[in-house]
Amino acid sequence: MSSSSREGSPDWLRSYEAPMTTSLLSLSSSDDDSPYRESEVISSLPLPDDDGDDIVVLETESVELLTRKNSETKVVTKQVSIEQVFSRKKKADASLNLEDSCAGKENGNNVDCEKLSSKHKDAQGGADSVWLVSSDSEPSSPIKQEVTVSTEKDADFVLEATEEEPAVKTVRKEKSPKTKSKSSRKTPKEGNSAQEILKTEDKDTDTTIAEQVTPEKSPKTKSKSSRKTPKEENCAQEILKTEDKDKDTDTDTIIAEEVTTDQKIKPSSGSSSRLPLVLSEKVNRTKVLVECEGDSIDLSGDMGAVGRVVVSDTTGDMYLDLKGTIYKSTIIPSRTFCVVNVGQTEAKIEAIMNDFIQLIPQSNVYEAETMVEGTLEGFTFESDDESNKNAKTAVKPADQSVGTEEETNTKAKPKAKAKGETVIGKKRGRPSKEKQPPAKKARNSAPKKPKAKK
């Protein structure tokens, strides 16, 4: 039997190897409910039909063949991927909601609730695959049917279970059994390609579900994220402090600048920066401002009349003689200005002028080297030497005898005076310092006379 059954089976059954995954199989011999259903069915999944009744997908081969050759002849079906539930807490909540919803249903639906709960437990343990064997009461044409379980979110899965809506959806039977059997047969290559496509679609759905789940966080996670660690709080406080310090420094600098400007504007008390300007009753118009080209006029230390003004009648020019240098002057009009004499207590305006004089040097007296010749007769001199010289020229020469007598008399008088002084000095005991200078005078005057004789 085994060899004949293998020979009768198609090629895709021979090349198939059973996957090492836990599978859920539902078996029956006919479309109608049979007495062997409860004993032989391991587990079944509810499938929605047009009438709304639960239909169990069964294999039409005989139960005896399947029981004898369970390991050899297994029909290849498309693996249905059940998406794994993301968090364990949500899995537990979903299982509790399933049990509560099943408790309120009738006895007829208890089997379905048990199936849903077992499938949910299997999904918690891992991504176990579900295998379904289906046929349309034809033993020669096994049919594969796609069964997709959509569990994008645990909450949606629980709502569907509580509202008595089946979680497992199948494609409705619209075609005839023959057309389905022909269209459902695929080569192994097509089966492998279909599995790869399903895997890629599962990956895409996983990524989309993950993207949907990430923005929708639970309030616990939001509260955790809103809670800051002490380090983060300290950093935030330090940032606020630095901002406050920067603001304070900015305000301090602005205030300091305002204070400095006020200090510059306000003069210090007791300073001589401000003086009252006094205008005399009569303004002096005799003062002149002079501008000199060339050599500067040095009037330092000079007092009194330093120069003279020469005005020619013919040309109408005015010449100014300053310390021997003659300057040609030209009057140039200008803006009104004043000469101010600044003192310790006040500033007094001494002159107001509307023009100034520009000087151009013409000639110098010292450069001309002029000589002046003449006699000094008739001039008297106060010095003794000059008076003696004048007397010598006027006195006539006298006799020699008279001159000798005068000389002897002049010599005898100082000797007698010297003897008297010594006697008086001894008697009185006083020094003779007072009478020594006249003796020197006599000595000095004695030699002058012989010079005059010569």
Curated annotation (Swiss-Prot):
Comp. bias (Basic residues): 438-454
Disruption phenotype: Plants show a severe dwarf phenotype. In bin4 mutants, a specific DNA damage repair checkpoint is activated preventing further progression of endoreplication cycles.
InterPro entries documented for this protein: BIN4
Keyword Iron: no
Localisation per UniProt entry: Nucleus
GO CC annotations on file: DNA topoisomerase type II (double strand cut, ATP-hydrolyzing) complex; nucleus
Ranges annotated as biased composition (Polar residues): 132-150
Highest taxon above the source species: Eukaryota
GO MF term (any one): double-stranded DNA binding
Claim: Nucleus is one of the keywords in the record: yes
Tissue-by-tissue expression: Expressed in expanding cotyledons, vascular cells, elongating root cells, developing leaf trichomes, root and apical meristems and lateral root primordia.
BP GO annotations: chromosome organization; DNA endoreduplication; epidermal cell differentiation; positive regulation of cell growth; root development; shoot system development; trichome morphogenesis
Name by which UniProt lists this protein: DNA-binding protein BIN4
Gene: BIN4
